[in-house]
Each structure stands twice: as structure tokens, then as C-alpha cells.
Amino acid sequence: MSEQDLVVDARGTKCPVPVIEVARASRDLPPGSVLVLLADDVAARSDVPAWARMRGHAVAVGDADADGVTTYRVVLGAGQADRST
């Protein structure tokens, strides 16, 4: 993480809160901004990448740490939007 990354801490929340929180945080940020999501909800492992694809963002999903917290690094506007849905 860099000093400029916006960190969204959704630890302890359940689906759909992690995706809602990262979507809310992304609203006012320009393309190229980086959001780092911390979440321990297992559903976020599929929900966050799906949301990112639909919105045209790139996402890197890290491995869960010993406490079950996964780090998601979302780069806004750096992916291809999924127009199939």
C-alpha cells in the first residue's frame, strides 16, 4: 500500500457490506485511484472481483492472512467493463 491508497476496512462485516463500502468509496475518485479493501467475509472473494469487472476496474486479490483477512487492491478504471450483463 502507498500513502495515497484509500483503505476501506470492512473486517467484521458480511455480504453485501464489503462491496457496498468499496463502491461507496469509489464514487468520488478519479480513474487511476487505488482502493485497498480489507475484508474477512468469504463471499467478498467472488463479490469484489465481479463488481470490479462490471465497473471496469482492475482488482488484485491477496491471500487471506492468519486472521482470515483478505486484501483487495482495486485500481479504478484500469480494467475492461463487462458489458455482457
Regions found by a protein language model. Name each.
Residues A10-G62:
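Amphipathic, hydrophobic secondary-structure cores in small proteins
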